[in-house]
């Protein structure tokens, strides 16, 4: 019995050591499924339509193809073709045909498709990475920062900056760092979109910027974009390191050994 357990354990360790790292990654769910959009019943017509096609030629005493005493093709006592007590063709208690019990035509239908629900995983992911700005093509808005103290080389510009720094942005727009090859590209894109968006928004409110304002704004935003890049890079590498750590063969062996001790 002990040799059998030892042999099984050696086989498990061998398989775990050579297992593909890709198995640790979460596979995307296939598309489709229940309540994923589209018509669940593509072959159905409107609920108020005829459930049976009209039949030509009736029997004895049928002027328009119905039963005995049916002037317009319905059941007994049906003036316009419906079930018992149906004046215009429908189910019992249906005044104008079609639908289930208590349904007048297309009004008050049962089993309506439910409204699509918000995917909370996507909401949580967006909240963790930053607020996604829909009108800016996938850019995210970073958290608020303290405006840096910058010296511009002259007393006039330094004083002007201290007096007007509250008019400059304290948040930057950016894309995920994995979409850029280096820090310079990230910062360049971050500065351009942030200055442009802030200028347009502020100008719409009736406030204009001078050339001095634009110059200082670019310097301020550049420093904040560098800070944002450092934050995002650190978080990105930490996530990558965690994935590599838990998918390495030694860690898999250790976890398998602990599971064996607990179960055995």
Swiss-Prot record:
Biased composition (Gly residues): 55-107
Binding site for Cu(2+) 3: 88-90
Disulfide bonds: 190-225
Recorded GO CC terms: Golgi apparatus; plasma membrane; side of membrane
Positions annotated to bind Cu(2+) 2: 80-82
Record propeptide residues: 242-264
Region (6 X 8 AA tandem repeats of P-H-G-G-G-W-G-Q): 54-103
Main location: membrane
Membrane topology: Lipid-anchor; GPI-anchor
Pfam families on file: Prion, Prion_bPrPp, Prion_octapep
Subcellular locations according to the entry: Cell membrane; Golgi apparatus
GO biological process assignments: protein homooligomerization
Secretion signal span: 1-24
Region Disordered, residue ranges: 28-119
Function, in words: Its primary physiological function is unclear. May play a role in neuronal development and synaptic plasticity. May be required for neuronal myelin sheath maintenance. May promote myelin homeostasis through acting as an agonist for ADGRG6 receptor. May play a role in iron uptake and iron homeostasis. Soluble oligomers are toxic to cultured neuroblastoma cells and induce apoptosis (in vitro). Association with GPC1 (via its heparan sulfate chains) targets PRNP to lipid rafts. Also provides Cu(2+) or Zn(2+) for the ascorbate-mediated GPC1 deaminase degradation of its heparan sulfate side chains.
Entry-linked PANTHER family: DOPPEL PRION, MAJOR PRION PROTEIN
UniProt disease link: Variations in PRNP are responsible of transmissible bovine spongiform encephalopathies (BSE), a class of neurodegenerative diseases that affect various mammals. These diseases are caused by abnormally folded prion proteins. BSE can be subdivided into at least three groups: classical, H-type and L-type, with the latter 2 collectively referred to as atypical BSE. Susceptibility or resistance to a BSE disease can be influenced by at least 3 factors related to the host prion protein: protein expression levels, number of octapeptide repeats, and specific polymorphisms.
Note: This protein is produced by a bicistronic gene which also produces the major prion protein/PRNP from an overlapping reading frame. The alternative prion protein/AltPrP (AC F7VJQ2) and PRNP have no apparent direct functional relation since a mutation that removes the start codon of the AltPrP has no apparent effect on the biology of PRNP. In mouse and hamster, the alternative initiation AUG codon is absent and is replaced by a GUG codon.
Family membership: Belongs to the prion family.
Subunit structure: Monomer and homodimer. Has a tendency to aggregate into amyloid fibrils containing a cross-beta spine, formed by a steric zipper of superposed beta-strands. Soluble oligomers may represent an intermediate stage on the path to fibril formation. Copper binding may promote oligomerization. Interacts with GRB2, APP, ERI3/PRNPIP and SYN1. Mislocalized cytosolically exposed PrP interacts with MGRN1; this interaction alters MGRN1 subcellular location and causes lysosomal enlargement. Interacts with APP. Interacts with KIAA1191. Interacts with ADGRG6.
Name used for this protein in its record: Major prion protein
Organism ancestry: Eukaryota, Metazoa, Chordata, Craniata, Vertebrata
Gene: PRNP
